[in-house]
UniProtKB/Swiss-Prot annotation:
It is an enzyme of class 3 (hydrolase). Catalyzes the cleavage of 5-oxoproline to form L-glutamate coupled to the hydrolysis of ATP to ADP and inorganic phosphate. The gene is pxpA. It holds the Pfam family LamB_YcsF. Belongs to the LamB/PxpA family. It comes from Bacillus anthracis. It catalyses: 5-oxo-L-proline + ATP + 2 H2O = L-glutamate + ADP + phosphate + H(+). Keywords: ATP-binding, Hydrolase, Nucleotide-binding. This is 5-oxoprolinase subunit A.
Amino acid sequence: MTTIDLNCNLGESFGAYKMGNDDEILPFVSSINVACGFHAGDPSVMRQTVEKAMQHNVAIGAHPGFPDLIGFGRRNMNVSANEVYDYVLYQIGALDAFVKAAGGKMQHVKPHGALYNMAATNPEIADAIAKAIYHMNSSLSLYGLANSEAFIQAAEKYNITLVQEAFADRTYKEDGTLTSRTEENALIKNEDEAIKQVLQMVKEGYVNSVNGEKVAVQAQTICLHGDGEKAVQFARKIYRTFEHNKISICAPK
């Protein structure tokens, strides 16, 4: 039976501001990425998200981003590799404290937004992220964009496990990178089209780029975004589609 991990970015509320559909999404995913306070989230939200994840028995990962609350961590920043290392180590350490306090164990790290996209094409940024993971806990996996040489080389250098990731509702360019959110066609808004893309990636190992070219994708995890208007409906639909196609949903071992 084919096996795939479904991951989702959660814990993105901040103070009085609620974001996402965390409670409704949790039953349909096998792992989550928890915002660590730089681009979203706060200490109370981090604790509550960890506790809920443990109740649903899903794998818990840190979701470190740039210190950019106003831009939600989606804007590129001109930072050094040392700064990236510091940002990532600080954030994953904070989440790990909450996970340990709840009696759990953190499984992975997935960079957020602009940090993720920069790392996918910038070896120095990817290296800094992998080094922070290695120094924090080398048993943690790194979730990174499928086929990214920067992520692959960084994970190999520090001997950490890379879990290659694809996206259910994002379009791809011919080089295998994601279409920028600044472009109109970055998101797939039609649920049926998104599910068709996911099945192609999981069962056939490719995705159609925005120009119609086939791009090879060997994904071990699929990202669902939990903050969209129909996020819960889509999560439920993809979960049932996988069941129908005898695709087992579970976190990477």
